[in-house]
């Protein structure tokens, strides 16, 4: 792929629409404007009304055009945006005309933002913030994406890198001047204190219970219990539709069924699972294993108990967590004696008690999302690099405390700096760039 290619794409929603935006970036914009726009190359950063024609002079449409010369543009290159009527025929004619010109092609997903990254206009976390704000469905997702897009995460990572650069400079004093009598003693203690402070800060960031990733990707609630306890009926009630098959036959649900919705201002994945019981059926047994895995990974577990015929062995077979919610179902029937302590009594079939349960679920998710203010980590990629960087910080501190050599400590600090640099995209990220930008829409 030549960096000299001029790229173009529809940057607005799919047609038909009142207005469409076609975006171009690259060094052939001057030639395109002269050949296809009646106004020629417009005055920079001014909306200019003009007629847009194809290579044969046929009128495509009349609309506005805005020219933003590089390097002071989103991509750092010359960019042009066409504001035309958003009908399919106009868009098809316009884009086919542009891409028929030599050196002009359709942009790949995220290519405009990738060029902005390569031009140093944004770093990798800010680029991810662009993708996240486009995909944001909730105010919480939007706020987190805006913070990332405007450099909120970068600021923290850059501060850590700056601190480590200062620490590295101090360690290298000891490496470069080993014969200075007081240098090691005067330098090592402050460096250890600085490393310890950084270790605590990174550990605190890693101890956020994944809230940043969950705000972005969704929290998970697992509905578990014995067969025929009403799990699928409750899922359908919470989903507002028939997402799961409901029958009176135990073991109907054999795989995990997930429903996505907003609760407590957050994206939530509700999982209906296979009934937990011993079974010789190979397919059902696999469903039980999947149910146990989903339960282990969930942010909240709902234990469904059949109020008429409770199977308490299910409650006893899984390690109980303080956040677990026990729900007695079939409250519209005569309840059996010996029910366990429960939090809510409902009839999933009729809906009695479900609004109160749903409100409790929303409160739990809302409180969990608010438990960490301004998370530093919003993607698994960030977390993995921080974990590796933290290991380097521990190794550097150990090398200094045990006296195994400042050279080893210096190398560990350099590695930690590289891990932090990989988060913002300043070093060693070629292997992840494709994955990051492929998640974007074409026109961004």
Residue ranges of model-derived segments:
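Conserved G/P- and acidic residue-centered "switch" motifs that form tight phosphate/ATP-binding loops
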Residues: 120, 228, 272
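Inter-motif core of Ras-like GTPase G domains
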Residues: 284-308
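A glycine-rich (often HGG/GG-containing) alpha/beta subdomain
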Residues: 1-143, 147, 151, 326
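C-terminal-of-GTPase-core extension/linker across diverse P-loop GTPases
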Residues: 2-14, 53, 139-262, 279-281, ...
């Amino acid at each position: 792929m030549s960096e000299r290619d001029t790229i173009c794409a529809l940057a607005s929603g799919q047609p038909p629409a009142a207005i469409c935006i076609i975006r171009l970036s690259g060094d052939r914009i001057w030639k395109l404007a002269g050949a296809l726009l009646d106004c020629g190359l417009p005055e920079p950063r001014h909306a200019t009304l003009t007629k847009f024609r194809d290579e044969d002079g046929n009128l495509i449409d009349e609309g506005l055009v805005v020219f933003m010369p590089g390097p002071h543009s989103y991509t750092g290159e010359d960019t042009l945006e066409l504001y035309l009527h958003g009908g399919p025929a106009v868009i098809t004619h316009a884009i086919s005309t542009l891409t028929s010109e030599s050196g002009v092609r359709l942009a790949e997903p995220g290519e405009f933002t990738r060029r902005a990254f390569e031009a140093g206009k944004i770093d990798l976390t800010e680029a991810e913030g662009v993708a996240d704000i486009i995909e944001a469905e909730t105010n919480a997702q939007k706020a987190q994406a805006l913070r990332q897009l405007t450099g909120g995460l970068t600021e923290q990572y850059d501060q850590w890198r700056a601190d480590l650069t200062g620490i590295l400079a101090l360690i290298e004093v000891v490496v470069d001047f080993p014969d200075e009598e007081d240098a090691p003693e005067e330098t090592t203690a402050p460096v250890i204190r600085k490393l310890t402070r950084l270790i605590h800060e990174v550990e605190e960031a890693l101890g956020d219970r994944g809230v940043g990733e969950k705000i972005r990707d969704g929290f998970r609630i697992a509905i578990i219990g014995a067969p025929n306890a009403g799990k699928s009926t409750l899922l359908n009630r919470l989903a507002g539709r028939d997402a799961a098959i409901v029958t009176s036959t135990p073991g109907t649900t054999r795989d995990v069924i997930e429903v996505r919705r907003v609760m407590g201002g957050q994206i939530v994945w509700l999982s209906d699972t296979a009934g937990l019981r011993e079974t010789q059926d190979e397919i059902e047994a696999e469903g039980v294993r999947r149910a146990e895995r989903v339960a282990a990974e969930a942010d909240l577990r709902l234990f469904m108990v059949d109020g008429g015929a409770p199977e308490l062995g299910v409650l006893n077979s899984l390690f109980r967590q303080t956040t677990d919610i026990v729900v007695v179902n079939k409250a519209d029937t005569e309840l059996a004696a010996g029910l366990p302590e429960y939090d809510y009594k409902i009839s999933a079939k009729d809906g009695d008690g479900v609004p109160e349960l749903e409100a409790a679920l929303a409160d739990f998710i809302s409180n969990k999302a608010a438990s960490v203010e301004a998370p530093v980590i919003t993607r698994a990629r960030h977390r993995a690099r921080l974990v590796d960087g933290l290991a380097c910080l521990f190794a550097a501190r150990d090398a200094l405390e045990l006296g195994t050599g400042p050279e080893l400590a210096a190398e560990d600090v350099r590695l930690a700096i590289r891990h932090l640099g990989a988060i913002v995209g300043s070093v060693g990220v070629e292997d992840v760039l494709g994955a990051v930008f492929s998640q974007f829409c074409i026109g961004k």
